[in-house]
Amino acid sequence: MFKVADAPLDGRVPDGPIADKWDNRKNELKLVSPNNKRKYEVIVVGTGLAGASAAASLSEMGYKVKAFCFQDSPRRAHSIAAQGGINAAKNYPNDGDSIWRLFYDTVKGGDFRAREANVFRLASVSGSIIDQCVAQGVPFAREYGGLLSNRTFGGAQVSRTFYARGQTGQQLLLGAYSSLMRQVGEGGVTMMPRREML
């Protein structure tokens, strides 16, 4: 627990070994019956890459979602500026990549300032994130045989960066946007453009 002045900051990180923290927490949570999901309304503030993906995914799970957007359209989010790629521990080139290696490289790249349990969770689900992006239609670069291409990037020792040439952020945002708009069309998400939140 950190302290700023006299106010404690609690990250709400579960207890236990780092590899089991979030899995144990997920297994302890109560389930919401599919019949009851429409009783809950989820508010998503921001429709950039994270917000649009979250709103679309929650709607696909059966929740009613209200998505608030500061701009006219989610396509104007600053997520579009990302260029390099997205890292995932899929070990396609068989060069010894693993969740632990991605975890270590990420913590080290963040100058050991990140919350390690959260970074481990990110490394654990990184492969699923790439799969979700592909399912949303993100045109990642591919090898001649059709497999997703990846490269080394930054301080990584292995090839784990999935990319869409120099437009990774744009393509990821367009994939999330198309999923979000599909859910808006189906009535699962209510878009609130040009809104500010306090």
Where are these regions (language model features)?
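Conserved N-terminal/central alpha/beta ligand/cofactor-binding core
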Residues: 1-24, 29, 70-198
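Generic recognition of flexible, low-complexity loop/linker segments
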Residues: 31-32, 54
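Short, hydrophobic/aliphatic alpha-helical segments
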Residues: 33-34, 63-75
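Short helix-loop-beta connector
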Residues: 36-39
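N-terminal Rossmann-like FAD-binding beta1-loop-alpha1 element of flavoenzymes
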Residues: 41-67
